[in-house]
From Swiss-Prot:
It comes from Cereibacter sphaeroides (strain ATCC 17023 / DSM 158 / JCM 6121 / CCUG 31486 / LMG 2827 / NBRC 12203 / NCIMB 8253 / ATH 2.4.1.). Monomer. One of its GO terms (cellular component) is cytosol. InterPro entries: aa-tRNA-synth_I_cd-bd, aa-tRNA-synth_I_codon-bd_sub2, aa-tRNA-synth_I_CS, aa_tRNA-synth_I_cd-bd_sf, Glu-tRNA-ligase_bac/mito, Glu/Gln-tRNA-synth, Glu/Gln-tRNA-synth_Ib_cat-dom, GluQ/Sye. GO terms for biological process: glutamyl-tRNA aminoacylation. PANTHER family: GLUTAMATE--TRNA LIGASE, GLUTAMATE--TRNA LIGASE, MITOCHONDRIAL-RELATED. It catalyses: tRNA(Glu) + L-glutamate + ATP = L-glutamyl-tRNA(Glu) + AMP + diphosphate. Belongs to the class-I aminoacyl-tRNA synthetase family. Glutamate--tRNA ligase type 1 subfamily. A motif ('KMSKS' region) lies at residues 243-247. PROSITE patterns: AA_TRNA_LIGASE_I. GO terms for molecular function: ATP binding; glutamate-tRNA ligase activity; tRNA binding; zinc ion binding. This is Glutamate--tRNA ligase 1.
Length: 471
């Protein structure tokens, strides 16, 4: 049988549906997706919903929405772990038949009494079942669990692509339960059975699962199954180096969508959280697929840096095709529960993207810069901009308006008219631009007056200048 690393790559993302898709889970899914896609492999999605009390359909939907927004498409149908419980139980019984597991009739009370006694005597509290080597003829007619018969000497070695060689002394591991007394499988069994049956070749997951790898390796070996390639990635910490929590800001992937970050920028930034390709900070998803490898993942926790996130997202907005950018803005408005753009607003915005998209790090920032194109008359100036409209400035606007009405409405013609007018009046262009910004946008900081005029058109420009002159 070929080694897992020599077979076509199959990765998987296996979240528990107990809440939203955490940003750490989003990065784990991304790493699995990049590794599979870059090797023309398969990326699978499994929902680990065996905890029926905590698992909810709403959480599953939230996970799927988060992955879809990130652009992480999976292959085949979504697998439900709970739906495979009969298969898990079948494997537990096969382990019994192989002598790799045994029935344990010890009650919870007996196990707790053992541990209390061990603590009192200063002994290890690791439970050693008296039923491990018991003659089956001595088995009582009573409820039992099935425990894996773990080796009690030697060591289990994990060759991890990120963590390196990790050794576990077998004497420190107990005979874990694989099937409960009610016939339901434990997570530790279910995950191995599912990964084997789904043909997973590479298990890429958080390093909080590293200890599980030793026990799961024992299950693989007990069943004579090939052990996958392990890659346990470090967790994400906050900017202060502490475990990521709500006090650090948004935790859910969908929150980032609602805050207006572009999905391509999020993929880029999350890929750089813990993985590197030289000094490259900005790259496309296609480049990431080509470059991504497990050897580039560091062992230390990555720190979330919102300034870097915004910088990367700004670069992605700047290079987006206009049609794609308009689609993403529409999706952002829907996710943030904000009113959709009218046809007129959308037309003006798309017309002005050339002057806006290299100035914004998020969609809200872009839309704020585009307010001049989205607002309807009369334009209400803020306090700072209103100061530029004194009687002299209003007179200038009244005098300028007829000249603009006759313009060809090209940037070159508008620039020539405004420059000549300012020169004729003996004023610097900045002094002319100030009342124009107020009239057109009601703000002191705007795109260039030429860009604003071109975006909103001749009629709207003249109407806004006339409104301001008459105010």
């Amino acid at each position: 049988m070929p080694a897992a690393s020599d077979k076509p790559v199959v990765t998987r993302f296996a979240p528990s549906p107990t809440g939203y898709l955490h940003i750490g889970g989003g990065r784990t899914a991304l790493f699995n997706w990049l590794y599979a896609r870059g090797r023309k492999g398969t990326f699978l999605l499994r929902i680990e919903d065996t905890d029926r009390e905590r698992s909810t359909p709403e959480a599953t939907d939230a996970i799927l929405r988060g992955l879809t927004w990130l652009g992480l498409d999976w292959d085949g149908e979504v697998v439900s772990q709970f739906a495979r419980k009969d298969r898990h139980a079948e494997v537990a019984r096969e382990m019994l038949e192989r002598g790799a597991a045994y029935k344990c009739f010890s009650t919870q009370e007996e196990i707790e009494a053992f541990r209390e006694s061990a603590r009192a005597e200063g002994r290890s509290t690791l439970f050693r079942s008296p039923w491990r080597d018991a003659d089956p003829t001595s088995h009582p007619d009573a409820p039992f669990v099935i425990r894996m018969k773990a080796p009690r000497s030697g060591e289990t070695v994990i060759e991890d692509e990120v963590q390196g060689t990790v050794r576990f002394q077998n004497e420190t591991l107990d005979d874990m339960v694989v099937l409960r007394s009610d016939g339901t499988p434990t997570y530790m069994l279910a995950v191995v059975v599912d990964d084997h049956d789904m043909g997973v070749t590479h298990v890429i997951r958080g390093d909080d699962h590293l200890n599980n790898a030793a026990r799961q390796t024992m299950v693989y070996e007990a069943m004579g199954w090939e052990v996958p390639v392990w890659a346990h990635i470090p967790l994400i910490h906050g900017p202060d180096g502490k475990k990521l929590s709500k006090r650090h800001g948004a935790l859910g992937v969908e929150e980032y969508q609602a805050m207006g970050y572009p999905a391509a920028g999020m993929r880029n930034y999350l890929a750089r959280l813990g993985w590197s390709h030289g000094d490259d900070e900005f790259f496309t998803s296609e480049q990431a697929m080509d470059w991504f490898d497990l050897g580039g993942i560091g062992r230390s926790p990555a720190r979330l840096d919102f300034k870097k996130l915004e910088s990367v997202c700004g670069q992605h907005i700047a290079v987006m095709e206009d049609a794609e950018l308009m689609r993403e803005i529409a999706a952002y408005l829907a996710a943030a529960r904000k009113p959709a753009l009218t046809d007129l607003q959308a037309a003006r915005l798309e017309k002005g993207l050339y002057a806006l998209k290299d100035r914004a790090k998020t969609f809200p920032e872009l839309l704020e810069k585009a307010r001049f194109a989205l607002e309807s008359r009369p334009i209400v100036a803020d306090d700072a901009a209103a100061k530029a409209l004194d009687p002299v400035s209003r007179g200038i606007l009244r005098e300028l308006t007829p000249m603009l009405q006759a313009a060809s409405w090209s940037k070159q013609d508008l620039e020539a008219i405004l420059t000549a007018f300012a020169s004729e009046k003996g004023m610097g262009f900045g002094k002319l631009a100030a009342p124009l910004r107020t009239a057109l946008a009601g703000r002191t900081v705007t795109p260039s007056v030429y860009d604003m005029m071109l975006v909103i058109g001749r009629d709207e420009t003249i109407a806004r200048l006339e409104d301001a002159a008459a105010a």
